[in-house]
């Protein structure tokens, strides 16, 4: 999987950037995503996170991670409105699945609050957002249980334990 990483803050250590790429590639293999899959991750500060949270979620505060899932629109590729395409073909034509925005301020706060390493927190946020992009959610108790169990399984197998 290809992950484009952007550090808008200029403060994220190169080790965290590499870890983020690696843990997302690891998670992609766990979900059996194609190697051609692409996504982006942008590291932001709380001010930018607040702005994005307001824009995309209509929530007036910063948050730790914002996940924007991308679904290709077949109308961008074909003019025949009556033609329906299999999802696999759409994925091949546009392998970009979405983007994450991770707040470095929230990552530092939460690592301290939860008493684990900053590496663990960045990994947690990346995998959490990645799972959202891939259809997982935690609004209902059974969804939360499934998503959080998978998230912990990925992080533990990768080596980011509490």
Curated annotation (Swiss-Prot):
Lineage: Bacteria, Bacillati, Bacillota, Bacilli, Lactobacillales
Pfam families, alphabetized: YbeY (PF02130)
Cofactor: Zn(2+)
Note accompanying the cofactor annotation: Binds 1 zinc ion.
Name of protein: Endoribonuclease YbeY
Subcellular location: Cytoplasm
Keywords linked to the UniProt accession: Cytoplasm, Endonuclease, Hydrolase, Metal-binding, Nuclease, Ribosome biogenesis, rRNA processing, Zinc
GO molecular function (one): RNA endonuclease activity
Main location as per UniProt: cytoplasm
Alphabetized InterPro entries for the sequence: MetalPrtase_cat_dom_sf_prd, YbeY, YbeY_CS
GO biological process, one term: rRNA processing
GO annotations of cellular component type: cytoplasm
Similarity comment: Belongs to the endoribonuclease YbeY family.
Function text: Single strand-specific metallo-endoribonuclease involved in late-stage 70S ribosome quality control and in maturation of the 3' terminus of the 16S rRNA.
UniProt KW Protein biosynthesis keyword: no
Source species: Lactococcus lactis subsp. cremoris (strain SK11)
Name of the top EC class for this enzyme: hydrolase
Originating gene: ybeY
Residues bound to Zn(2+): 128, 132, 138
Enzyme Commission identifier(s): 3.1.-.-
């Amino acid at each position: 999987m290809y992950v484009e990483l952007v550090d808008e803050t200029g403060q994220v250590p190169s080790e965290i950037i590499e870890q983020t790429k690696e843990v997302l590639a690891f998670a992609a293999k766990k979900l059996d995503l194609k190697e051609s899959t692409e996504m982006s991750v942008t590291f932001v500060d709380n001010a930018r996170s607040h702005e994005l949270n307001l824009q995309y979620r209509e929530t007036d505060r910063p948050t730790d991670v914002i996940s924007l899932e991308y679904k290709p629109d077949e109308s961008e590729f074909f003019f025949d409105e009556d033609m329906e395409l299999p999802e696999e073909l759409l994925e091949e034509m546009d392998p970009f699945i979405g983007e994450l925005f991770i707040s470095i301020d929230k990552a530092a706060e939460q690592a301290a609050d939860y008493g684990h390493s900053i590496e663990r927190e960045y990994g947690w946020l990346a995998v959490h957002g990645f799972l959202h992009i891939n259809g997982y959610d935690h609004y209902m108790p059974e969804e939360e249980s499934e998503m959080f169990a998978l998230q912990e399984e990925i992080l533990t197998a990768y080596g980011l334990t509490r």
